[in-house]
From Swiss-Prot:
Protein name (database record): Yellow-related salivary protein SP03
Tissue: Female salivary gland (at protein level).
InterPro entries: 6-blade_b-propeller_TolB-like, Royal_jelly/protein_yellow
Organism annotation: Phlebotomus perniciosus
Signal peptide start and end residues: 1-18
Protein function: Probably modulates blood feeding of sand flies on vertebrate species by binding and sequestering different mediators involved in the host response. Binds biogenic amines. Binds noradrenaline with medium affinity. Binds octopamine with low affinity. Poorly binds histamine, adrenaline and serotonin.
First-listed, main subcellular location of the protein, grouped into a coarse class: secreted
Superkingdom of the organism of origin: Eukaryota
High-level lineage: Eukaryota, Metazoa, Ecdysozoa, Arthropoda, Hexapoda
SUPFAM superfamilies: 3-carboxy-cis,cis-mucoante lactonizing enzyme
Keyword field: Glycoprotein, Secreted, Signal
Family: Belongs to the major royal jelly protein family.
Cellular component terms per the entry's GO annotation: extracellular region
Residues with glycosylation annotation: 29
Length: 388
């Protein structure tokens, strides 16, 4: 997911008190439980993604490996640490991971990650040798989270794994079992979507014009403008239909448009695929990630340029008049991840530093903030609320 996600929100407590925030964590820097801070680089320990398991009350947090970041997949027990800036613990199920950008939890309480298989810096190839990118799943229902699935993505499918963006896990019939699962991974550099069929242990990639950057995005930071050019980045899944398929909603990192495709088409290794443009969210609404809430039928967007969380009810047409804002802060700089947990809680994260070269982090303010809100409360009184 390229290190620009690692170069990412000097976040303070200003400007957020008016929002109905249920939980908030804020770190000036990341520390690891049981590891001497002198043994690793604080400035390189940049969180990019997370997933909250509502059953265990644990948050799984990813830190792409830069030299010398000791752990790429960690966990946080929210029962022990309900707020503040707690240290992160090593995820017990991972010993040989190279570099992970984002975790996802599915309906079967499996934690999925995509290991890029390589790091983004030179000089330590002997210490951290390059491997094939891999899709890995862990069982959160068992002690120590045993690994239950691993698939190495062929190089001709993975392309440049440092271009992996978000991904979504599609369990086609969770009520009857978890064996039939697909994983959809975006690649914003190659402008492709990777499909993994867990049952058949096969994968393929799809290309389409809607995966390409729509334009050059202008990111304003400290009064200066910087250009980003990012292809398909965020993806989220809608409701299951009677045939076990869903609508997959996706967006480009340098686009204000939203598209959808039926997963029925994505699951076919060869064949015609119908991609549908849904509309435009409006100027300066570029986002890296989005999350669908099945209870409210609302999609939430984490907008990196406008420093806000916006919403759109999928039962309405998509245009700027039907977009609303549930959170905004001038200090919410370059949000990187957003997701729903199984209790319909919305979680979103900013890591404090935009993708700008030669910008030094300062550690007198929180750089990382993780916030949760109740979805129904957050959209109450907004355009995203559909009243009966």
């Amino acid at each position: 997911m390229k290190i620009f996600l690692c170069l990412i929100a000097v976040v303070s407590l200003q400007g957020v008190l008016a929002y109905d925030i249920e939980r908030e964590y804020a770190w000036k820097n990341i520390s690891f439980e049981g590891i001497d801070p002198a043994s690793y680089s604080v400035k390189n320990s940049i969180v990019t993604g997370f997933a909250h398991d509502a059953d265990s009350k644990k948050i799984f947090i990813t830190i792409p490996r830069l030299n010398p970041v000791p752990i790429t997949l960690t966990e946080l027990d929210t029962t022990k640490h309900p707020e503040g800036s707690p240290p992160l613990s090593k995820f017990p199920g991972s010993d040989k991971l190279i570099s992970v950008y984002q975790p996802v939890i599915d309906e079967c309480r499996r934690l999925w990650i995509v290991d890029a298989g390589q790091v983004e810096y030179k000089g330590d190839e002997q210490k951290i040798p390059k491997k094939n990118a891999a899709i890995i799943a862990y069982d959160l229902t068992k002690d120590n989270y045993p690994e239950i699935d691993r698939y190495e993505i062929p190089n001709n499918v993975a392309g440049n794994p440092l271009g992996f963006g978000g991904f979504a896990v599609d369990v086609t019939n969770p009520k009857e079992g978890c064996g039939k699962t697909f994983v959809y991974i975006t690649n914003f550099e190659d402008n492709t979507l990777i499909v993994y069929d867990q049952e058949k242990k096969d994968s393929w990639k799809i290309s389409h014009d809607s995966f390409k950057p729509e334009h050059e995005s202008i990111l304003t930071h400290n009064g200066a403008q910087h250009i980003l050019k990012l292809g398909i980045f965020g993806i989220t899944l809608g409701d299951l239909d009677e045939e076990g398929n869903r609508q997959a909603y996706y967006l480009g990192g340098s686009s204000t448009k939203l598209f959808r495709v039926n997963t029925k088409d994505l699951k076919k290794k060869a064949g015609q695929i119908e991609f549908t443009p849904l509309g435009d969210r409006g100027s300066h609404s570029e986002a890296l990630a989005l999350a669908y809430d099945p209870k409210t039928k609302v999609i939430f967007f984490i907008e990196y340029n406008s420093k806000r969380i916006s919403c759109w009810n999928t039962q309405k047409s998509l245009n700027p008049d039907n977009i609303d804002v549930i959170y905004h802060s001038p200090d919410f700089i370059f949000g990187t991840d957003i997701s729903m947990d199984s209790e319909s809680k919305l979680w979103f994260f900013s890591n404090g530093h935009p993708p700008i070269e030669n910008v030094q982090l300062t550690f007198d303010k929180p750089h990382f903030r993780l916030i949760s809100m109740d979805t129904k409360k957050s959209i109450h009184g907004t355009k995203c609320e559909v009243k009966p």
